[in-house]
């Protein structure tokens, strides 16, 4: 279905602001010209709420009351994702970046961060990012991240809702 990604992200922000992101600076930097995304709204909310929840936990870990999360959107021309079936390259130009100013992902976890049972937390099963990666792939998208002390950014690339770019 065609989905307004900004409506999804605004719902995620509202849910997070009253919960995990309480006490954090939560801002957005949206590209107003984005076309609709292709996808399942509930799954997209699940994807981004999980990423914002992780970002909030990282930002709170600063312990100085200055934790912040920024949600960016952009259109990236020419980004292609290889589809599993038939190895067709599919456009995934919608970019959503969720950035926090927490301590960063420990180096020893970076290679396996999207695997099940890998976690930076002492509590929890470590299934969050594995599920996020599976849901993103199911949408014909891509997820990656960059991390350094003081900043981690998760980037999700999604297809737009048009005949040629929607997964079969």
Write out the residue ranges for each language-model feature.
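A conserved beta-strand-to-alpha-helix junction within the catalytic ATP-binding
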Residues: 1-13, 72-74
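Conserved micro-motifs of the catalytic ATP-binding
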Residues: 36-39, 120
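Conserved catalytic submotifs in the C-terminal HATPase_c
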Residues: 10, 23-35, 74-76
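Short beta-strand/loop element within the Bergerat-fold HATPase_c
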Residues: 66-79, 90
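Detector for a conserved hydrophobic position within an alpha-helical segment of the HATPase_c
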Residues: 136-137
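Short conserved segment of the HATPase_c
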Residues: 89-93, 105-116
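Short alpha-helical Gxxx[C/S/T] motif in the catalytic ATP-binding
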Residues: 128, 132
């Amino acid at each position: 279905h065609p989905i307004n990604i900004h409506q999804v992200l605004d719902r995620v922000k509202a849910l997070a602001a009253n919960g995990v992101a309480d006490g954090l600076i939560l801002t957005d930097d949206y590209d107003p010209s984005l076309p609709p995304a292709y996808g399942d709204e509930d799954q997209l909310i699940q994807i981004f709420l999980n990423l914002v929840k992780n970002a909030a936990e990282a930002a709170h870990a600063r312990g100085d009351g200055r934790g912040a999360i920024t949600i960016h959107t952009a259109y990236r021309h020419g980004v292609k994702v290889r589809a599993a079936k038939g190895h067709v390259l599919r456009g995934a130009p919608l970019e959503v970046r969720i950035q926090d100013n927490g301590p960063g992902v420990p180096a020893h976890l970076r290679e396996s961060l999207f695997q099940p049972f890998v976690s930076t937390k002492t509590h929890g099963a470590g299934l969050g990012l594995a599920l996020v990666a599976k849901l993103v792939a199911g949408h014909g998208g891509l997820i990656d991240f960059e991390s350094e002390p003081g900043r981690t950014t998760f980037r999700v690339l999604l297809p737009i809702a048009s005949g040629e770019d929607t997964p079969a």
